Amino acid sequence: MFQGVYTAIITPFKNDKIDYDSYNKLLEKQIKAGVNGVVPCGTTGESPTLSHTEHAELIRETVKAVQGKIQVVAGTGSNSTREAIELTEAACKDSVDGILSVNPYYNKPTQEGLFQHFQAVAEHSSVPVMLYNIPGRTSINLQPETVFRLSEIKRIRSMKEATGDLGQMGKLISLVGNKMTVLSGDDNLTLPLLAIGGVGVVSVVSNLFPKAMVEMVKYFQDGRVIEARKIHYDFIEAFALAFMETNPIPIKAAMSWFGHCEPEIRLPLTRLSQNETSVKFKKALEVLKEKGYE
């Protein structure tokens, strides 16, 4: 089962192609920081605008680059169950450690439809499955009772919870017990979720500050709550501003500001608006760097 810090890694582009030179350096940064794993081809990795060829290649290159030093949990979700199965089978052949499967979006299935979708995906996976509940993106909420049913399926072992609803997360954890691990899908709720039984985060901010996110989670797990709380408070403004526009627009801009990639992003997403809020975001990140956070 997955626990700890998993970075929802960006996909750097250069001249509208994946920039593997920059990408491999980002992976090295993550490994050095001690994250538990990376999640390529997710929301933050701009998966909706990757071609099937790019999607498969990016997963393959990620596995090759990390050399087993950290886990690779590949995003293989789709609103077509058939396509999700195809992407999952391809990722499994490339020796990933797990798959991240998002709620089917746009077609708005019922809870029974969600159950059958994830059941079908799990049946075609040779690795553990992390469910991904993000109703703000998909317009459908995977209810705790449905997740409890899914927890009976052997391959379904974890969940990335991005509802922003701690009440729902608490109910979920109380239902699934030790059958599944629950990780935060929102950086600003990582510490609160840990306090009610969560075990980690699939983080956006860890693209830029992986070591800090690893330290915060580890401090909490070691009972050093005051130290964990300090990191959380220091990052509160950055956590909020990292979502001032649609993810991954702000984090892509931030990574380019600090020389990690080009600012290029694929339509229909556009580059970060230049205004007082973006200036505030850059300043907040610079302050964190000045404090020694990495």
Curated annotation (Swiss-Prot):
The record marks T43, Y106 as: Part of a proton relay during catalysis. Its EC number is 4.3.3.7. It holds the Pfam family DHDPS. SUPFAM superfamilies: Aldolase (SSF51569). The active site is at Y132, K160. GO terms for biological process: diaminopimelate biosynthetic process; lysine biosynthetic process via diaminopimelate. Pyruvate binds at T44, V202. It catalyses: L-aspartate 4-semialdehyde + pyruvate = (2S,4S)-4-hydroxy-2,3,4,5-tetrahydrodipicolinate + H2O + H(+). NCBIfam families: dapA (TIGR00674). Catalyzes the condensation of (S)-aspartate-beta-semialdehyde [(S)-ASA] and pyruvate to 4-hydroxy-tetrahydrodipicolinate (HTPA). PANTHER family: 4-HYDROXY-2-OXOGLUTARATE ALDOLASE, MITOCHONDRIAL, DIHYDRODIPICOLINATE SYNTHASE. Belongs to the DapA family. This is 4-hydroxy-tetrahydrodipicolinate synthase. The lineage of its organism: Bacteria, Pseudomonadati, Spirochaetota, Spirochaetia, Leptospirales.
